[in-house]
């Protein structure tokens, strides 16, 4: 049974769905009572993909969870966010983060100290939206940036993705919200405490920092199929530099096979407990119970990230099967 509390849905840019179908999913989520729909930027452009979601909906919040800040200058991010917030009538939320350094290097992007870059990036976005004279930092420097139309909300919410303690503390200090990911409820509770403490230290009201947590969700009545689906997504995350600290397991053979392109072999070597730690899997009752654990850990908005079951993305099933207020 899912409670009537806030719930979000994430649609992956690499789901293979045409943008129009993503919009249809967003409308279905809105009709089912979801509070927010996000685009997760994998290989596509999350900000561009927010357009069809906004066009298809009328009340649900739409945002990115997340967009890779390194891919776009902060002035461009601010201009795009202002347009999306205007188009949505004030429903847009900008979720930012950094892909891992190896991926950004692959894209030919310059490397900067992550904390400094994120803090300055947010400052530039806010300066542009507020019409301030400019910003001068160690990485970014801008003059006043004109916009064609005044922002619908000069203070539109900016959320930061954070995994480690330093980025969590930065989010608590400067962001409107934090986006957690790849965490067990226990790890999420620790992250919540870090964010709240940092907000208080900065003289902010801790509860004003929204805690969003992406919950990978593999929904299937066949428990074994759901467990397989949960394990199948681990190799992709095993290559993330933070994997050892996130999963508490070296995952050496999984990483070796994944780097060699043997994804099937990598999946076979995934310890089930690693997948269990951050994936809600099983039938609606099992997934719903797991999501409630995140709420008890202090998460304000769990965001369901549907995981393929035997190769098929179960968006429609997740939207209806785990809808807010639905009993199972």
Predicted features along the sequence, with ranges:
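Active-site-adjacent structural elements that line small-molecule/cofactor binding pockets in enzymes
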Residues: 1-328
